[in-house]
C-alpha cells in the first residue's frame, strides 16, 4: 500500500500530469483538498472509490483516514492543488507517515505561477532583464515569515517576484516594492489561473489600485517585474547562428565535436 501525493495543477482539470491522472485511476481511496482542487479530476477515480474532501478535516483526521486505508491494504491518492513543493502542507503529512512507517511517493504538478505566466503569455526570465524568479508570500494567520524573508529584501535583487497569498494586503505590498522597482514597474494579478472564471489585471505599481475594480479573492497571484511588459531584451545566445554548442558544433575546431560526450 502506498500513499501517492499528487500535484493536481493550478485549476484546469486537463493540466494534471498523465502520471497523476493514472495514479488517481488506480487508487481505491482518494483524498482531495476540495477548496482548491477541481471536482472534475474526481472523474478519474475508479468506480466505487472512497472519495474524501479534506477541506474541513484536521491533520489528525486526515492521517487517521490514510492509516485506515493502509490497514486495509489500499493505495491512496492524496490530491493537492498546484505543485506539492510549495505551500502544500505536505511536509507535515509526510512526517506523520514516516513515523507510522506508511510508504508514500510524490508526483509533481503544474504550479500556479507557471499557469499565471502562461495566461499572460510571458517568459519571466528575459535575457538582460531578469534571470531569477522569487516565489514568496507575506505573513498570514497560518504561517509567519522567517526573519529576513521580507519583500524589501527580495525586491533589492530586482528579480521577478511571484507573490502568493497576499492580495488581501495589496496596499502593503505596493508600498514595500515601489522604492526598489519604481512606480512604472509592470504588475499583473492573476486570479484563479487556468480556471474557466480566471481574471487578469495588468497595471504598474503606480496604477494598480485604480485598476483592480472588484476585490479579488485570496487565490490571486501577484507578479511583479520588468519582464512582464518589455520588448527591450537581449536574444538568447542559445540559438544564435555563431554559438558553438553541443548539438550544433561549428567551425573546424568546435568546442563539442560530434560524437563527444
Curated annotation (Swiss-Prot):
EC main group: transferase
Matching SUPFAM superfamilies: Tetrapyrrole methylase
Signal peptide, first to last residue: none
GO terms for MF: precorrin-4 C11-methyltransferase activity
Pathway it works in: Cofactor biosynthesis; adenosylcobalamin biosynthesis; cob(II)yrinate a,c-diamide from precorrin-2 (aerobic route): step 4/10
Disulfide bonds: none
The EC number(s) this enzyme carries: 2.1.1.133
Pfam families referenced in this protein's UniProt entry, alphabetically: TP_methylase
Top-rank taxon: Bacteria
Keywords, in A-Z order: Cobalamin biosynthesis, Methyltransferase, S-adenosyl-L-methionine, Transferase
Transmembrane segments: none
Record family assignment: Belongs to the precorrin methyltransferase family.
PANTHER family hit by this protein: COBALT-PRECORRIN-4 C(11)-METHYLTRANSFERASE (PTHR45790:SF4), SIROHEME SYNTHASE-RELATED (PTHR45790)
NCBIfam families assigned: cobM_cbiF (TIGR01465)
Protein name: Precorrin-4 C(11)-methyltransferase
